[in-house]
């Protein structure tokens, strides 16, 4: 593979985008290209079929081969997040949020939604998405000291578990 920018490019690829295979080795550039293209076209096929758009398997296969060849030769590149996550089980199991670079959440309805904005911010941050927000909800809520006995909360050690824990904590000070 002609990395184009010397050893630093290859180092960056293996450090950032190459995924560990089932045998414990890291993906080669060819492995990554196949994963990314198969991932992209599987999402495209699922979307097309669920949206009642005609799916031509033969045409898609030809396009996938052309895209893979061009990607392998660095004639085009997906976003870095596409190299990192496309074609992984994470996208099918957890959704495509990790393919996004940035997101936005409004606080305008914070008095009705309480912890929802904060939970979204944490959830997206935990998959590497930068999250912007406004201050339209400023002054709409006030924190209170929780009353009664502390409640034991068992936190699943997962992204979803920690997001739920944050929501419970924030809500305990806003109810």
Residue ranges and their predicted role:
Residues 1-175:
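Extended catalytic cores of very large enzyme megasubunits
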